[in-house]
Regions:
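Catalytic cores of nucleic-acid endonucleases
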Residues: 116-170
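Acidic-basic catalytic patches of nuclease active cores, encompassing PD-(D/E)XK
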Residues: 12, 48-96
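Hydrophobic, Leu/Ile/Phe/Ala-enriched alpha-helical segments that form helix-helix packing faces
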Residues: 5, 80-88, 162, 166
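Active-site beta-strand-loop-beta-strand hairpin of nuclease catalytic cores
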Residues: 103-113, 122
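Nuclease-adjacent, charged terminal/linker segments that flank catalytic cores
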Residues: 1-52
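Non-catalytic C-terminal interaction segments of nucleic acid-processing enzymes
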Residues: 3-4, 160-203
Length: 203
């Protein structure tokens, strides 16, 4: 257990602050902020406006890689689950032994399969999709790679780059890459359509 703990956690550095975006520890080298996620460094408050952490022996934080590549994607997955449940859908995390991230079941029985991705660079996600397409044999009516909205700030064509890769490498795939905002709109719209169809059947 101690080995696992030491591989996942490290002491909190002196003069650390709570990152207002991801909740990890933000440090400063001069005026330059440092965090595990580059998107956290955009439009940050002044150092004096951040919440300082009082250092004491025994204070721990997740290591950079664990926070960046495990915790942050997990936050996105939980956000997708929350959106689905708010729409009245069932949401199962990590179905089929974590084959993908979220299985959403709509009120009419439709299944949507979601893989949440936090790659800041679309070409990294493109390569990941080409090397490891997770939706092979997945039984679902719709399939999505969902990325945070701020990924499109630096790369407005982010989703197009990934969708072009899907069309080229997996022409029979129904998967598509969308931002969280677009995914939320599509899910809410589909749920409303389901409700309308059910109402029309009863009329």
């Amino acid at each position: 257990i101690n080995k696992i703990f030491s591989e996942a956690y490290e002491n909190v550095p002196n003069w650390s602050y709570v990152c207002p975006k991801c909740g990890w520890t933000m440090t400063f080298y001069g005026a330059q902020a440092q965090c595990c996620n580059k998107s956290c460094l955009k439009n940050i408050p002044k150092k004096d406006d951040l919440k300082p952490l009082r250092f004491q022996d025994g204070n721990w934080r997740l290591r950079h890689g664990v926070m960046r590549y495990m915790c942050l994607p997990g936050q996105l997955e939980l956000k997708i689950q929350k959106i689905a449940e708010k729409c009245g859908c069932g949401a199962e995390l990590w179905p089929d032994r974590d084959k993908y991230d979220v299985k959403i079941t709509l009120p009419d029985g439709q299944v949507w399969a979601i893989d949440a991705k936090t790659h800041r660079n679309p070409y990294m996600l493109k390569k990941s999709i080409e090397n490891d397409y997770v939706f092979t044999h997945t039984k679902a009516q719709k399939v999505f790679y969902v990325v945070p909205d701020d990924c499109l700030t630096d790369y407005p064509d982010y989703c197009k780059i990934c969708n072009d890769a899907l069309a080229s490498s997996f022409p029979d795939s129904i998967a598509k890459c969308v931002s969280m905002r677009i995914f939320s709109i599509e899910l809410k719209g589909e749920v409303e359509d389901v409700k309308l169809r059910n109402y029309q059947k009863k009329s």
